[in-house]
Swiss-Prot record:
The lineage of its organism: Bacteria, Thermotogati, Deinococcota, Deinococci, Thermales. Keywords: Hydrolase. InterPro entries: Acylphosphatase, Acylphosphatase-like_dom, Acylphosphatase-like_dom_sf. This is Acylphosphatase. GO terms for molecular function: acylphosphatase activity. The active site is at residues 18, 36. The keyword Hydrolase applies. It catalyses: an acyl phosphate + H2O = a carboxylate + phosphate + H(+). Belongs to the acylphosphatase family. Its EC number is 3.6.1.7. It comes from Thermus thermophilus (strain ATCC 27634 / DSM 579 / HB8). It is an enzyme of class 3 (hydrolase). Residues 3-88 form the Acylphosphatase-like domain. SUPFAM superfamilies: Acylphosphatase/BLUF domain-like (SSF54975).
């Protein structure tokens, strides 16, 4: 299965973005994590079926109500066997 790495830029810290990503990932059966970065972005890594990852990416680009997503840098790769979906 593929691996999605998304670096999300905008007003994405302090607005519930990581919890939003976790909720959507779990709804879609994805594994991975969401983590705040020191530069103000959020890194989201997810693994699972390609179709679920593409839908997840759509949600990441929208974000929760209080967020303002300006850009999402995306990289695709091979899965690393992550379990669960964690927020750091």
């Amino acid at each position: 299965m593929p691996r999605l790495v998304a670096l999300v830029k905008g007003r994405v810290q302090g607005v519930g973005y990581r919890a939003f990503a976790q909720k959507k990932a779990l709804e879609l059966g994805l594994s991975g994590y969401a983590e705040n970065l020191p530069d103000g972005r959020v890194e989201v890594v997810a693994e699972g079926p390609k179709e679920a990852l593409e839908l997840f990416l759509h949600h990441l680009k929208q974000g929760p109500r209080l967020a303002r997503v300006e850009a999402v840098e995306v990289q695709w790769g091979e899965e690393a066997g992550l379990k669960g979906f964690h927020v750091y």
